Amino acid sequence: MKRLTTLLILLITISFLGACSTNSSDKEKENQLIIGIDDAFAPMGFRDEDNEIVGFDIDLAKAVIEEMGKEAVFQPIDWGSKETELQSGRIDLIWNGYTVTEERKEKVLFTEPYLANSQVVAILKDSDIKSLSDLAGKSLGLQAQSSASNALNSSDIASEIKDVTEFKTNVLALQDLENGRVDAVVIDEVVIDYYMTIKPDTYKVLDESLAPELYAVGVKKDNNELLEEVQKAMDEVIANGTAAEISEKWFGENKILN
């Protein structure tokens, strides 16, 4: 009888501890926001030499989510499937140099833009390409499912391009540019500016840009409550100067839109 009583007490204790652990885990998840990122999109979000995820958007997201009283968890995703990841609930936010477009507005909710950008054309420093018109008959590269594709397709030069190769990341596109497999790369200005600081003798950018654009945070279409919470926290981080400090850290100047 004593042995049976001991066994019952043990089982009850194990069940209780398991329930406590589950409740603790559930509360922890409730306090987290999963942010979908492209972890090869420097300087917005990328892996450093220690394989840590860093970048302008990473620091900004941390500050905003902390202002909300929550924890930011960064989830690298296939950028071509970002909206699917959001709609499925596997991530809560898309936040990594995410350009506002009319097409995307049909799929997601956007915060107010916080940063301006342009789609530009990167070439090798010794290239004979001098203007957009010189791209006629040339091979171009760009990141798949990115706003670079929209910018190129909407340009006057689009019909004269020889061919376009889509890459999983901008890094791969720039590698093919260096190896001579493409003649130019359509890319975010903030991204190529970063790589030109690393390789100043390798790349240059045409003076003419393809399209201006704005970065914002993407939220699931029906989640207006989360959108409002993120926007309120973003406004505070901008107002108190934290966003400007983060911009100075990564860009050397305050690029934040007020």
Model-inferred region functions:
Residues D39, A116-I123, E189, D193-M234, ...:
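Periplasmic-binding protein-like
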Residues I58-E67, D126, S133-D134, S139, ...:
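Extended ligand-binding regions for polar small-molecule ligands
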Residues T22-S25, S147-T165, K204-D207, M234-N258:
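Ligand-binding clefts/hinges and TM-proximal coupling segments of bilobed small-molecule sensing domains
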